Amino acid sequence: MARIAGVDLPRDKRVEIGLTYIYGIGLSRAQEIIAATGVNPDTRVKDLSDADVTALRGEIESNYQVEGDLRRLESLNIKRLVDIGTYRGRRHRMGLPVRGQRTRTNARTRRGRRQTVAGKKKAPGK
């Protein structure tokens, strides 16, 4: 099993798809990496030679921020927005949509589940 950037790539998938299991690498970036290293994209991960794995690992580590470094960078960017008090920072802090989406309805993913509110009790019928 090939281990790149701390992630075990699935053995039976094509290299192109296997690389997308690394946080920060999507399909187009995986294709760029494969083109730069000269690895055949149709090769299965289990069929990669040690030289291929080393080439892929070197390309990713030298030219891309992935996994923990990328997560840390994103959290620092959000923290910076919160600290300087921008509108986007306030939205992050309040747990609301940041990019101008409506909140009167929808936005359930960002706001979380509905909070139930106790309704008025019905008066006993006569």
UniProtKB/Swiss-Prot annotation:
Superkingdom in the source lineage? Bacteria
Sequence segments annotated as region (Disordered): 92-126
Task: Locate the transmembrane regions by residue number.
Answer: none
Residue ranges annotated as compositionally biased, kind Basic residues, are 101-126
- Gene3D superfamilies reported in the protein's UniProt record: 1.10.8.50, 30s ribosomal protein s13, domain 2 (4.10.910.10)
Q: Does the keyword Ribonucleoprotein apply?
A: yes
Concerning SUPFAM superfamilies, the annotation shows: S13-like H2TH domain
The biological process GO terms on file are: translation
Family, according to the entry, reads as follows: Belongs to the universal ribosomal protein uS13 family.
Q: What does this protein do?
A: Located at the top of the head of the 30S subunit, it contacts several helices of the 16S rRNA. In the 70S ribosome it contacts the 23S rRNA (bridge B1a) and protein L5 of the 50S subunit (bridge B1b), connecting the 2 subunits; these bridges are implicated in subunit movement. Contacts the tRNAs in the A and P-sites.
Name assigned to this protein: Small ribosomal subunit protein uS13
Organism of origin is Nostoc punctiforme (strain ATCC 29133 / PCC 73102)
Give me the gene this protein comes from: rpsM
